Amino acid sequence: MVMFKKIKSFEVVFNDPEKVYGSGEKVAGRVIVEVCEVTRVKAVRILACGVAKVLWMQGSQQCKQTLDYLRYEDTLLLEEQPTAGENEMVIMRPGNKYEYKFGFELPQGPLGTSFKGKYGCVDYWVKAFLDRPSQPTQEAKKNFEVMDLVDVNTPDLMAPVSAKKEKKVSCMFIPDGRVSVSARIDRKGFCEGDDISIHADFENTCSRIVVPKAAIVARHTYLANGQTKVFTQKLSSVRGNHIISGTCASWRGKSLRVQKIRPSILGCNILKVEYSLLIYVSVPGSKKVILDLPLVIGSRSGLSSRTSSMASRTSSEMSWIDLNIPDTPEAPPCYMDIIPEDHRLESPTTPLLDDVDDSQDSPIFMYAPEFQFMPPPTYTEVDPCVLNNNNNNNNVQ
């Protein structure tokens, strides 16, 4: 019977554990080995990988696809490697710490940003292998983060984005006016911590009370075997005051902050992470009027964008101090562990934007308070007329 020798510790350690790497940068670290007893080691190897993969079930069919970004293999040596003669094995003894250094460069060009979603991920890791004669190979694995640069200061992403939409409202096939919304944001590209300054105009000519709102929404698109899977998350939102029938409302620099989220992933062929600013009007008893303004979340923010963001935030706070009633901000994605389950939807966008309190603060029609009648008298099974007749008879007798 072969007795397996235990290893006290076997781990991969990076020189800068907190660093987020970019294309062309060097990843360096060491593999640390400690033993409990004298051990002969044939080799210490590493394998570095970066891969995007998607996987989900479409009925009985498995949709699966992978895309490699990185693959690097090497056999490591000690700086002063003690050997056991001809076979060149390393003799490791208890009480000593053996360190094998490694280093490699990430490929130049676009790399997928590290990401973990419901149906796919982009992972980068280093795996170490400890080969011993007559013993099973021992493995140790360590992940590291990679972020592909997305510069939001390009002319395309600094250009304003605008849209407008109008919807006819009806009740029992009878026309009931219109609801219209037009909106504009100063630019398309933002970074974590930036404030989106929203300029919008709303008009309500229907008989219902409507509520204007805005939300940042993430869309994760997975592609495999010719099939597409879309997963939507509502990240943060803000709302305005009710708009009664026959009136208008405007937002002039209403602010919505970009929470802690991953940059957009647009260059991957099997996995995309896209963001949108949805400006919409909740119309009770009818579909929402929704404007979809595309956003690009970047990894680099310039001074000009940050300055304009702060300026818009200040003006918005001064102008809307009495009117801005924001929703409680929700946790941003890492995605799968911190997004509430009720905001993880694979259905269309409209159910995603439904709010629990719509039925309470958005009556369908404007109406006068209902008249309350007096309650009926207390019911009794004893006829008071019979009691009165009996009392009168007793008095006569």
UniProtKB/Swiss-Prot annotation:
What superkingdom heads the lineage? Eukaryota
Phenotypic effect of disruption: Marked reduction in the numbers of natural killer cells, low levels of Il2rb expression in the precursor hematopoietic stem cells and severe lymphoid hyperplasia in the small intestine.
Q: Which residues carry this modification: Phosphoserine?
A: 362
GO CC annotations? Answer: cytoplasm; cytosol
Q: Which GO terms describe its molecular function?
A: enzyme inhibitor activity; ubiquitin protein ligase binding
The alphabetized list of GO BP terms reads:
cellular response to tumor cell; keratinocyte differentiation; negative regulation of cell division; negative regulation of transcription by RNA polymerase II; platelet-derived growth factor receptor signaling pathway; positive regulation of apoptotic process; protein import into nucleus; regulation of cell population proliferation
Record keywords: Cell cycle, Cytoplasm, Disulfide bond, Isopeptide bond, Phosphoprotein, Transcription, Transcription regulation, Tumor suppressor, Ubl conjugation
Q: Where in the cell is it found?
A: Cytoplasm
Q: What is its main location?
A: cytoplasm
PTM (free text): Ubiquitinated; undergoes heterotypic 'Lys-48'-/'Lys-63'-branched polyubiquitination catalyzed by ITCH and UBR5 resulting in proteasomal degradation. Deubiquitinated by USP5, leading to TXNIP stabilization.
Q: Does Repressor count among this protein's keywords?
A: no
Q: Cross-link named Glycyl lysine isopeptide (Lys-Gly) (interchain with G-Cter in ubiquitin), where? A: 213
The protein's matches in PANTHER family, at most eight in alphabetical order, are given as: ARRESTIN DOMAIN CONTAINING PROTEIN (PTHR11188), THIOREDOXIN-INTERACTING PROTEIN (PTHR11188:SF14)
Its quaternary organisation is: Homodimer; disulfide-linked. Interacts with TXN/thioredoxin through its redox-active site. Interacts with transcriptional repressors ZBTB16, ZBTB32 and HDAC1. Interacts with DDIT4.
Family statement: Belongs to the arrestin family.
What is the name attached to this protein's record? Thioredoxin-interacting protein
Organism this protein belongs to: Mus musculus (Mouse)
Underlying gene: Txnip
